[in-house]
């Protein structure tokens, strides 16, 4: 998912924590 991709994790802190 998104949180396994560093850039997506950075751009989605409300999803990934």
Swiss-Prot record:
A Pfam family of this chain: Toxin_8
Cystine residue pairs: 2-8, 3-16
Region (Ser-Xaa-Pro motif, crucial for potent interaction with nAChR): 4-6
Top-level taxonomic group: Eukaryota
Keyword Secreted: yes
Keyword Disulfide bond among record annotations: yes
GO CC annotations, alphabetized: extracellular region; host cell postsynaptic membrane
GO molecular function: acetylcholine receptor inhibitor activity; ion channel regulator activity; toxin activity
Main location: secreted
UniProt keywords, alphabetically: Acetylcholine receptor inhibiting toxin, Amidation, Disulfide bond, Ion channel impairing toxin, Neurotoxin, Postsynaptic neurotoxin, Secreted, Toxin
Residues the record marks as site: Key residue for the high potency for alpha-7 nAChRs: 5, 10-11
Residues recorded as bearing Glycine amide in the entry: 17
InterPro entries reported in the protein's UniProt record: Conotoxin_a-typ (IPR009958), Conotoxin_a-typ_CS (IPR018072)
Tissue: Expressed by the venom duct.
Misc. remarks from the entry: Negative results: has no effect on alpha-1-beta-1-delta-epsilon/CHRNA1-CHRNB1-CHRND-CHRNE, alpha-2-beta-2/CHRNA2-CHRNB2, and alpha-4-beta-2/CHRNA4-CHRNB2 nAChRs. Its activity on alpha-3-beta-4/CHRNA3-CHRNB4 nAChR is controversial, since Talley et al., 2006 report no activity, whereas Ho et al., 2021 report an inhibitory activity.
Family in the record: Belongs to the conotoxin A superfamily.
Domain topic, free-text comment: The cysteine framework is I (CC-C-C). Alpha4/7 pattern.
Role played: Alpha-conotoxins act on postsynaptic membranes, they bind to the nicotinic acetylcholine receptors (nAChR) and thus inhibit them. This toxin blocks alpha-3-beta-2/CHRNA3-CHRNB2 (IC(50)=11 nM), alpha-7/CHRNA7 (IC(50)=27.1-59 nM (rat)/ 290 nM (human)), alpha-3-beta-4/CHRNA3-CHRNB4 (IC(50)=160 nM), and alpha-6/alpha-3-beta-2-beta-3 (CHRNA6/CHRNA3-CHRNB2-CHRNB3) (IC(50)=201 nM) nAChR. In the OmIA-AChBP complex, this toxin occupies all five binding pockets located between two adjacent subunits of the homopentamer.
Protein name: Alpha-conotoxin OmIA
Organism for this UniProt entry: Conus omaria (Omaria cone)
Upper lineage: Eukaryota, Metazoa, Spiralia, Lophotrochozoa, Mollusca
